[in-house]
A protein has these predicted regions:
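Substrate-binding pocket helix/loop in short-chain dehydrogenase/reductase
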Residues: 74-75, 82-87, 178-181
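N-terminal Rossmann NAD(P)H-binding glycine-rich loop of SDR-like oxidoreductase domains
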Residues: 10, 14, 18
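Active-site loop-to-helix junction immediately N-terminal to the catalytic Tyr of the SDR YXXXK motif
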Residues: 78, 124-132, 144
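Residue(s) in the substrate-gating loop at a strand-loop-helix junction
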Residues: 118
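Short C-terminal tail/terminal secondary-structure segment
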Residues: 201, 212-227
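Alpha-helical segment proximal to the catalytic Tyr-Lys
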Residues: 103, 146-151, 209
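Active-site helix of classical SDR
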Residues: 98, 134
């Protein structure tokens, strides 16, 4: 059993990852919101990634940082604080987690880190300036740390397209919007959190032991194909 620390594991993609990996691993979830999820292998710590000190643990084999934001505004209405806040949540929060648990990860026989990017760093999309800047920082972090931490610690990121989660509910607000979003993607679908969770489970497993420093698009074809 691996000891997995998941930050932001009570909603959306993070919650789906917890459900995907908890049967065969010890999972510690750090999140602001507690749920009624219960499992012998699951421990919850109330935690705010922006302000709280990361708790101490005896061992960490895998670190997964899930917090993100969808702050979509035209550049004319985005404030500097919007950029700062998105960068703090997406990048600084992840850096704090890595720095806190890096020594424990280096002691593991099978250490890995998983972060989250977005397809908006690969594809020019209106109103995505703030989140794209922040997630581009994640892309750079993964590439740099992939080189720096090898061979002891692997690090990768998943870059999803819009995913059917609570975070995206304001965008996927009615059937017409959902239909249009489906049509924009060459594979004619919207990504589910369970699909992302299965990819996450693979990337932290021994089956992915040769993979590090990579950002994996889960994009339903929107980045790679012309629809």
């Amino acid at each position: 059993m691996k000891n997995i620390v998941i930050i932001g594991g009570t909603k959306g993609i993070g919650k789906a990852i917890v459900s995907e990996v908890v049967d065969n691993n010890n999972v510690v979830c750090l999140s602001r919101n507690q749920t009624d999820f219960n499992h012998d292998n699951y421990t919850f710590h109330k935690f705010d990634a922006l302000v709280d000190d990361y708790p101490d643990f005896d061992s960490v084999d895998c670190l997964i940082y899930c917090p993100g934001s969808i702050n979509l505004k035209p550049i004319s209405t985005l404030s500097l604080d919007d950029f700062r806040n998105d960068f703090e949540l997406n990048v600084i929060g992840a850096v704090r987690a890595v720095k806190k648990y890096l020594n424990l990860l280096k002691k593991s026989e099978s250490a890995s880190i998983l972060l989250f990017s977005t397809v908006a760093t690969k594809l020019g999309m209106p109103y995505h300036a703030s989140v794209s800047v922040a997630k581009s920082g994640i892309d750079g972090l993964v590439k740099t740390l992939g080189s720096e931490l090898a061979p002891k610690v692997r690090i990768n990121a998943i870059a999803p397209t819009i995913t059917n989660t609570e975070l995206a509910s304001k965008i996927l607000r009615n059937d017409k919007v959902i239909e249009n979003m489906v049509e924009r993607h060459p594979l004619k679908k919207i990504l589910s959190s369970n699909e992302v969770a299965k990819m996450a489970s693979f990337l932290i497993s021994e089956d992915a032991s040769s993979i590090s420093g990579q950002i994996f698009n889960m994009d339903a074809g929107i980045v790679s194909f012309k629809s």
